[in-house]
């Protein structure tokens, strides 16, 4: 049994989280907003350093989060009901960690109280991304950074 004074992500199921609690699990790394390529042979997913046109390349925040689906119809919306599909998310992702019953890392803003730690610890790709406006889609393969685990 988990103590009542434990943080919400340790004592609640994903389905029990409020919208605010759910949104706060996002560490602000921006990795889910990077373009990904799928290997046709083995279905592996590879992250590129090519960012969605709405992603601020320094802050790793969406520049129009409330209206993102109007600008990017295939933008991914993470919800508790899709937790079984989170395997493509980085192993550091708060959504993935909590869905797997794991704790948040020490650098996560809900643990340390500092939203900049995700950048200072180089978890995010802040300053290392390119906008999709600047790279032709045929060249995305040249910008692979890691394979989803």
UniProtKB/Swiss-Prot annotation:
Pfam families: CxxCxxCC (PF03692). Transmembrane segments: none annotated. InterPro entries: Puta_zinc/iron-chelating_dom, UCP006173. It comes from the Bacteria. Belongs to the UPF0260 family. NCBIfam families: PRK05170.1-5 (NF003501), PRK05170.1-6 (NF003502), PRK05170.2-5 (NF003507). This is UPF0260 protein Pput_1301.
């Amino acid at each position: 049994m988990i103590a009542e004074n434990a943080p919400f992500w340790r004592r609640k199921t994903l389905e029990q989280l409020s919208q605010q609690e759910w949104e706060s699990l996002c560490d602000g790394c921006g990795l889910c907003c990077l373009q990904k390529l799928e290997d046709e042979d083995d279905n592996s997913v590879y992250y590129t350093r090519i960012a969605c046109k709405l992603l601020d390349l320094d802050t790793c925040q969406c520049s129009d989060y409330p209206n993102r689906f109007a600008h990017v119809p295939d933008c991914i919306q993470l919800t508790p009901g899709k937790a079984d599909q989170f395997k493509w998310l980085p192993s550091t992702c708060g959504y993935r960690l909590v869905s797997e019953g794991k704790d948040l890392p020490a650098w996560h803003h809900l643990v340390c109280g500092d939203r900049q730690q995700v950048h200072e610890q180089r978890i995010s790709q802040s300053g290392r991304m390119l906008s999709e406006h600047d790279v032709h889609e045929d060249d995305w393969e040249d910008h692979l950074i890691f394979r989803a685990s």
